[in-house]
Regions:
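Acidic, glycine-rich catalytic/binding loops that coordinate metals and/or anionic ligands
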Residues: 39, 136-137, 150, 156-170, ...
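Non-catalytic surface loops within mature trypsin-like serine protease
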Residues: 95-97, 128, 145-146, 192, ...
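Active-site loop architecture of trypsin-fold serine endopeptidases
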Residues: 175-189
């Protein structure tokens, strides 16, 4: 989710218009998203004022199988929407530090791939879904580069890396703001998602929410916008 000034005003305008036209049931989801947007802006302005919002990389919530992949505040959830037809496919976690400073760790062991043209992204194959062992899934990590595409991915994973085994907690890189458009970078964060297998041993298109999974049970937190109507994700 981009958090440039123009983007913020655009999102708020969409929320107001849809609230007027769509009625309460339609508005409720957008209102929750707008509430999260306000918190993201507050966090980016002064992370130190909200230490209770932050999660620590490598920690786990109870018996959840995945560790938190990075430090920071989970600002936007799976299923969040700020325009008609769009639903966010994963989580946006904002570290609150400068570019290239907030570590990104593997949430679960698996086999890492970085495609040759990936400047900011990695994907890890999990041969057995820990919650449904009869299927294979993938964990996806992105925005690990600056606005010009200078990568913050760890040197151990150069472009073209294929099927390299990594343990949970392995350093993958650092949070960045790469969007593909140098004139409109994202806020500094990690986008993390869980992607379904295509049935042929590869991953589906992560840009479509139907190809991703609700991360709530994997991280033990309320991370679906459909059911989380403004709660700050925390363990306990």
């Amino acid at each position: 989710m981009r958090v440039s000034r123009s983007g913020v005003f655009g999102v708020l305008l969409v929320v107001v218009v849809l609230a007027t036209l769509g009625g309460y049931s339609f508005y409720r989801g957008y209102a929750a998203g707008a509430s999260r947007l306000g918190r993201v802006m507050a966090w980016l302005r002064n992370p130190g004022a909200h230490p209770d919002w932050a999660l620590q990389a490598g920690d786990r919530c109870g018996n959840a199988p995945f560790a938190y992949p990075t430090d920071g505040f989970i600002g936007f959830l799976w299923g969040d929407s700020f325009r008609p037809g769009h639903r966010h496919q994963g989580l946006d976690i904002f570290g609150g530090q400068e570019l290239g400073q907030t570590p990104v760790l593997a949430a679960y062991p698996g086999f890492l791939t970085r495609l040759p043209d990936w400047k900011a992204s990695l994907i890890i194959r999990l041969p057995q879904d820990p919650l449904q062992p009869d299927r294979q899934i993938w964990t996806y990590y992105t925005h690990m580069a600056d606005e010009q595409g200078n990568s913050y991915i760890a040197p151990a994973f150069p472009p073209g890396t294929q099927e390299l085994y990594v343990e949970a907690g392995t350093l993958l890189g650092y949070q960045g703001n790469y969007s593909g458009d140098p004139d409109n970078p994202t806020g500094i964060h990690l986008h993390f998602s869980i992607v379904l297998d295509d049935g042929g041993g590869s991953f589906r298109n992560e840009l479509e929410i139907e190809n991703t999974l609700d991360p709530s049970p994997y991280l033990g937190l309320p991370l679906s916008a459909e059911t989380n109507q403004g709660e700050i994700p925390s363990c306990g």
